[in-house]
């Protein structure tokens, strides 16, 4: 059951990381995107995932998409936010003096990104990835609950709840924790 949840966790984590990095690059390089997209990114995290997950599962099932993808999308939804916030903070972390120095050397915006901004953002990225993988695991487990899955840690927790098997619930929780 752990492998089923791990697949959805990793798929959602990689999708969320890619989306988060791309959004962060756009937000840092485009003022209009900063003013328009960043508030929506922050607002997206105000709605509890337990309210959104059943809707995502139902909508995707209605168009014939079942299995790994709905769980991965729920995991992605939870894991992209820390990556966006961390990367925006990291890409904006170089001092103005460093940016001015690069411009003095006639650095292009791509050189500024690859030689200054991106290396400065790596510590922020890894801190964000640490938070993002945990959020992705939570998303995968939550995605298994309303889907009627028969395999996975969320399905084991749900089955334990149905049949009053507290050992099954706790074993799934401990497996998810480690």
Mark where each language-model region is.
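Transmembrane alpha-helices
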Residues: 73-77, 110-143, 175
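Generic hydrophobic transmembrane alpha-helix motif, especially the helices
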Residues: 42-82, 89-90
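Transmembrane-helix boundary motif in ABC transporter permease subunits
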Residues: 11-41
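Membrane-helix interface segments
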Residues: 29-37, 65-69, 109, 165
């Amino acid at each position: 059951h752990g492998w089923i949840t791990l697949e959805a966790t990793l798929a959602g984590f990689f999708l969320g990381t890619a989306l988060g990095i791309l959004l962060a690059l756009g937000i840092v390089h485009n003022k209009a995107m900063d003013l328009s997209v960043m508030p929506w990114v922050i607002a997206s995290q105000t709605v509890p995932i337990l309210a959104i997950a059943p809707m995502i599962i139902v909508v995707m099932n209605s168009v014939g998409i079942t299995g790994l993808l709905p769980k991965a999308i729920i995991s992605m939804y939870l894991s992209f936010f820390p990556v966006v916030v961390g990367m925006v903070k990291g890409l904006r972390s170089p001092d103005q003096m460093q940016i001015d120095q690069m411009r003095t050397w006639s650095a292009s915006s791509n050189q500024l990104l690859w030689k200054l901004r991106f290396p400065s953002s790596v510590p922020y990225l890894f801190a964000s990835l640490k938070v993002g993988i945990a959020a992705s695991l939570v998303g995968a487990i939550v995605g298994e609950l309303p889907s009627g899955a028969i395999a996975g840690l969320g399905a084991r927790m749900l089955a334990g709840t149905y049949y009053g098997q507290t050992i099954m619930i706790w074993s799934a929780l401990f497996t998810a924790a480690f």
